[in-house]
Amino acid sequence: MRRLGTGIGWRPEIADAVEEMPGIEWVEAVSENLCPGHLPDSLLRLRERGVTVVPHGVSLGLGGADRPDAGRLAALAERAEALGSPLVTEHIAFVRAGGALTASPSLEAGHLLPVPRTRDALDVLCENVRVAQAALPVPLAVENIAALVSWPDEELTEGQFLYELADRTGVRLLIDVANLHTNHVNRGEDPAEALAGLPLEAIAYVHVAGGFERDGVWHDSHAHPVARPVLDILADLASRVAPPGVLLERDENFPSGDELRGEVEAIRVAVEKGRAAATGTGAAAPTSGTGTDAGSGADDAVRQRLGLAQAALLSALVAGTPVPEGFDRVRLGVQARALAGKRADVVGKVAPELPVILGARYRPAFLAYAQDRPMTGGYRRDALDFVAHVLRTAPGDEGPGVRRELREWWLERSGPVPRSARPGARLARATRRVLLRR
């Protein structure tokens, strides 16, 4: 596997700090946030300096019951080619469920949800990975995710599941050591056992990220400093194999450039500590490495069984339907609140005017709206539906100015074409909003 070195997740909010950071050999950018024909100047400058850029996808849903969407695969391939990337990465997760396969409404999670570690789910995942590999111009690596909930009646450990996936498909692995720590706290899984079961030579690179613990639950926030136990797991991994690359992820609550540099240096120190204590202990590399699948394929009946199970879980999380048998109700409640909170955050970024218009009332109003109203059409549609809900159901105590602004916002964006593309009209509306607040 090509050596990448030490890297950091590129985000627009820290673009300047990343460019100025010494010793950064590569960066990773969220694929869905990039437009191939209009790449950010910061990424272009990094590329000109010889810094490798890897697109990191979050929306394929390779662990879902449906086959990967051709349009999403084409978009990921286009970004890899535009960036000259040596590989692309995605997640072992499902992000949507329902639809034609299960004859039920389509539901979007808005986040990465765990795949059951069963033979059925593994068959589906392997086939989906092969579909993706055939559509992509560069190698694919897939990431283990953090989980707040456990599926009942799982048949494989995480190490076994990942080993078989790599063995049957030849796919590379992106190992997130922060997610191993998350699963240790939330699911009682031993990170050392997981590492011992991994095909270490299949590792493409490693993620490191921060989080926090609340009421015995670890939240993989990507908004807090990297915890010592996560660095210890990284050192353990590095004692078993020299990872081709290690990357710091930070998505929210960005610290100063100096603090980011300190976190990157702590990662380097952990890797060096691990290499000094190298043991070389891990599972043997998959014997084929070519993707010769020794398992059975995923027929429609297998996909339907998995689809029904995933739809039932997702519906309980985002639509308030009963908790499926065998799941921990308390943990599902934590996961449901986390999904709703993330949804509120993303809608607030997609439609930044709404938190401004509603002020402190935005978040509680959105969480109340999302409690039993699943997202079905993406975040922009969700923002429109939320405002329509507020206008329809709110008692009117926001004040006439707030309701007027919400109504204008909704009318401006609800049609196929904005009501007015004239700069003068937009300026007049913006001026009126300012005057209303005086």
Curated annotation (Swiss-Prot):
InterPro entries, per the entry: MbnB/TglH/ChrH, Xyl_isomerase-like_sf
Region ranges (Unknown): 274-438
SUPFAM superfamilies from the UniProt entry: Xylose isomerase-like (SSF51658)
Disordered as annotated region, ranges: 278-297
Pfam entry (one): MbnB_TglH_ChrH
Family: In the N-terminal section; belongs to the UPF0276 family.
Descriptive protein name: UPF0276 protein SCO6045
Species annotation: Streptomyces coelicolor (strain ATCC BAA-471 / A3(2) / M145)
